[in-house]
Amino acid sequence: MSNRRNFLKILGTGMAAATANPVLAGVSRLKTDHRTLKIGLLSPQSNLFPAYPYSFINGFRLGIDQHQALRKKQIEIITEQVGYGTPFLSTQAARKLLYENNVDLMTGILGTEVVSQFSDLFQQKEVPFIVCNPGEYFPVEPLRKNPFLFFNTLNLYQSSFLQARYATTHYGKKGLIVTSLYDSGYDAVYAFTHGAEMEEGTTEVVILRQGTADTVSEALSRIRSTAPDYVYALLSGDLAREFILRFRNEENSSLPLMATPFVTEEHFLTTLGASAAGIETIAPWSRHLDHPASLDFVKNYRETTRSNPDMMAMLGYETGLLTYRALASCNGDFSGTSLAHALREARMTSPRGDFSFDPETGWAQTPMYLTSIRAGLFNLTPEPHPEVLPQSIAAHDLAFAALDTPLRSGWLNPYLFV
C-alpha cells in the first residue's frame, strides 16, 4: 500500500482540485431570443456493448437540458445513425447535418481516424464538432490544428501508457500483454509497450484468436512458460470474460492482473463475479467516485433513466453539459467562430473532475483514476475503488511522438463499437 501511495504522490498532489466547484458554478442561462439552436449528433451501434449508444444519448440529453433548454425548445437535437462508424456512412451523415439541417454544432461517437477523412468540412462550414470516443487513437497533427475540432474521450491509450508505468514500477520489469486481433488494432498496445520501456521494462504480446477453441489455453500456457511479473488483459467482450475467468480459476494465479477500464463496468463485473477481485486499471471515471459532481450526476441519471450510468453515459452527460455552457456563454452570438472560442475557453467541474480543453489542440484535459476491484461485501459483485491520479498525461504528449504520422493502420470504428 505504501508503494501505491508513493506512485500517487509521484504523479501529483491530491484530489482537492477535482472537487473544487459545483457543476453549474457561474453558468448563465442560455438566451436564444426565440431561436432554436440545432445540435447534430452522430450515433453508431455496438454489438459488444449494445447499451452504449443509448447511454451516451441519455447522458447527453440530461447534460444539455440545463434550465429545461430542450423542453423550452431552445435546443433541438438531430440524431443521425452511422452504423459502425464507417467512413462512408459517417461522411454522409455529417454532410446531411451540416448542409441540410444546418446545425450550429455537432457531436457524437466517432473514430478519430474516420474524422480525419472529412475534418475539412467543419472548417469550411465553420461548425464546431465535439468528437467523442473511448480514446483509442492518438490525435495526429492535422486534427490538432483544426480550430473547429474538439475531442472528449475516455483516454484509452493514455490509460494503457500509465498502467504500464504503474505495473512496471510496482510488480516488476517483465510484462505480458494478452490481446486479440481486434483489441490490438488501435494505439493501446503501443502505448502500453512504450510506457513499460520508459520504466526500463519489457513486454511480450500474446494474440488470442476469436473463435479458436484452444486460444485461451495457449495464452495460459504462454504465461506459465514466460513467468511474467504481471499480465495486462487488453481484451473486450466474451474473450475478455473467458480469459479472466480461466486465468483466475484454472490457474489460481496470484499474478497481478491489469485490464482496460471497461472491465470495471457494472454489467461486465456481474459476469465475472469474485474472479474480478484484484484486477487493477487506470480509468477515466467510476460511478463510485465520491465527489459532488459525480454523485449529483449518478443521482440524476438514475432518477431519469431508472438505471445506473456507465462510462458512455458519463461521457454523453459531460459533453451535453459542456455544450450548454458553451452556448450560454456566447451571449447571443452563435456563429461557429464564437462557439469554437467558447469551447476552447470552457472550464468546468464534470463528474470526473476538473475539465478543460487544451487551447492548442482542442483535446479535453481530465483526471484519471487508479482503480482496484475489491471483493464485494457478503460475496456480492466486486466493486471498483478509484483513487485520483492528480497528474494525467496529455493526449499529445511527446511520449507518443512516434504515433504522430499520416502512415497509420488499424480499425476505423470507435473501440467497442463493432
Question: Across the structure, where does each feature detected by a protein language model lie?
Answer:
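C-terminal segment of N-terminal export signals and the immediately downstream linker at the start
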Residues: 1, 23-44
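N-terminal export signals
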Residues: 6-27
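Extracytoplasmic "Venus flytrap"
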Residues: 40-59, 80-87, 185, 309-313
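Signal peptide-proximal N-terminal region
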Residues: 57-79
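Extracytoplasmic ligand/sensor domains, especially the bilobed periplasmic-binding protein
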Residues: 104-206, 256-274
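Extracellular/periplasmic bilobed ligand-binding domains
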Residues: 122, 189-282
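Extracellular/periplasmic periplasmic-binding protein-like sensory domains
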Residues: 246-317, 329-330, 395-403, 407-415
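Solvent-exposed, acidic/polar segments of extracytosolic/periplasmic ligand-binding ectodomains
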Residues: 351-418
